[in-house]
Amino acid sequence: MPNVKLPDGNVKHFEAPLTIYDVAHHISPGLAKAAIAGRVDGVLVDTSYLIKEDCSLIIVTEKHEDSLEIIRHSTAHLLAQAVKALFPSAQVTIGPVIEDGFYYDFAFERSFTPDDLSLIEAKMHELAKANLSITRRELPRNEAIQYFKSLGEEYKAKIIADIPENEALSLYRQGDFEDLCRGPHVPSTGFLKAFKLTKVAGAYWRGDSNNEMLQRIYGTAWADKKSLEEYLFRLEEAEKRDHRKLGKALDLFHFQDIAPGMVFWHPKGWTIYQELEHYMRNRLVDFGYQEIRTPQLVDRSLWEKSGHWANFRDEMFVTETENRHYAVKPMSCPCHVQIYNHGLKSYRDLPLRLSEFGNCHRCEPSGALHGLMRVRNMVQDDAHIFCTEDQIQSEVAMMLELVQSVYKDFGFTEIKYRLALRPEKRVGSDDVWDKAETALKLAMQGRNIEWVDAPGEGAFYGPKIECSLSDCLGRIWQCGTIQVDFSMPARLEASYVAEDGSKQTPVMLHRAILGSFERFMGILIEHYAGKLPLWLSPVQAVVLTISEKQNEYAEKVRKTLQKRGIRANFDLRNEKIGFKIREHTLQKIPYLLVVGDKEVENCQVAVRTRDGIDLGVMTIDTICDTLTQEIIRKGSI
């Protein structure tokens, strides 16, 4: 006779086994109607799950954090059912949940078209409205293989053949459609009220380019229509803000097939890049870093010693000359240890903070490349701090101060922190891990930082803090990393003479703030929709003449601005002023300085912003002072 403990601490006693739906109905008919699934002793199950023994139970409704994954997984099955109804010869393969949605891969003799997607989505709504019951059954492995083969579903049979023989196989049926799945699923298709198919793309079977190409249909699903509409709005906004489109429209950069995943920076884009580098260089000097430069092409022997050759070889560009094998560096860490090792180090030399704008190359798969967000050639704001175990906390605290300050200057104030803790397989003693993890926690506490623990997700060589930004659309971008490393210094024979004269191995702290310049620029462009803050804008002001009579004065204004350190340009073309204003507004130039006869006479400029705000007339000195102060304030405006 099961006793069921509910989240509020109450225990319900039942005289016989019963389903989760029955428990929900016992509490209230409304809860039973809203129940999507249940969590029994921490495990998600269907509402049809039979409770036979004492347990704790959370009844999952659409308001519960678990509901979205279940809704999306069930909607993927609804998609597959609709495709099979409309295109019976299509074979189903896999349909997992992904961030903000789901996809399903199909084997079909032709590509699905946008018109097909509209038909499929309409069929999905029809099936959802039918409120078909979703039921679960189990089959022995071999019987399941034969069952799907009899349906002509060869891919599904192959998937089952790869599942261990002792693993229970469950199938879910809705109407005349049945699919292999672990579950859980919603009780009926009527729970699926808010979904949208978003796109179709090609995908190789099992992700292997040697296999056949499948058709992947993507979709999104939410608990209610309001959430779906909000997501679709964000998706539309993200499309408008796509850094690849803005990069072309604003003449910042481009990509070419002659150098896949490598950026061709145009003058305006390179200006932004240089501003980032200049800013970071100055901040690092303030925090006691010494900038270094290491080779890009390094002998294979170093990568073997560091462990990168064994674990990272497929992502490295390699070459051979004079019977020696070299690799273009995918990261700077081993080279930084070489600089540390050059000369005897004492405990008095620690902490030693080395930084580099490391030019790195990684052989990312061509299908994974995505504008500035995923490239093969990137520059990282790499830094490595060599310190003692006792210095970890103070060094990490200093890094966190720098991280928070830098992100604030770029206009990001909502930062999420994640602490990746020791994995099962690791180097170093438990005492050392205890000390390192405690140091990271105390450093964050000292900065009043809230974080989420991620047990088991640390690297084998040390715990780490991950710093993620939230942009204007609520998207999360992991950029900063503070990684403790107990392994590499020992592998590469780094040492120092301790106070007692003994030879000791330093701890190495890997630190990145922006991550890569390329990706961070992509994030900035999308966050600001191309309207970068004044201090980052490639052209900060443009002087616009009404007629050629003001050309000489416009040149004088531009030169004055430039002498004050403001990136200024002028437009002397014989075009109407309205045309000029519109054109430079579309180019997202922060300030438009219009000069006509009256402005020339009074040594003034008429000031407009790119948002169309008229700031009136100002003297040249006043506009210079105004822009200079805004540049100094950076993200604190």
UniProtKB/Swiss-Prot annotation:
Cofactor: how and how many bound: Binds 1 zinc ion per subunit.
This enzyme catalyses:
tRNA(Thr) + L-threonine + ATP = L-threonyl-tRNA(Thr) + AMP + diphosphate + H(+)
| KW Zinc (keyword) present | yes
Residues that span the membrane, as ranges = none
Q: Does the keyword Nucleotide-binding apply?
A: yes
Name the Gene Ontology molecular function terms of this record. Answer: ATP binding; metal ion binding; threonine-tRNA ligase activity; tRNA binding
Where is it mostly found?
A: cytoplasm
The protein here is known as Threonine--tRNA ligase
Q: Which organism is it from?
A: Legionella pneumophila (strain Corby)
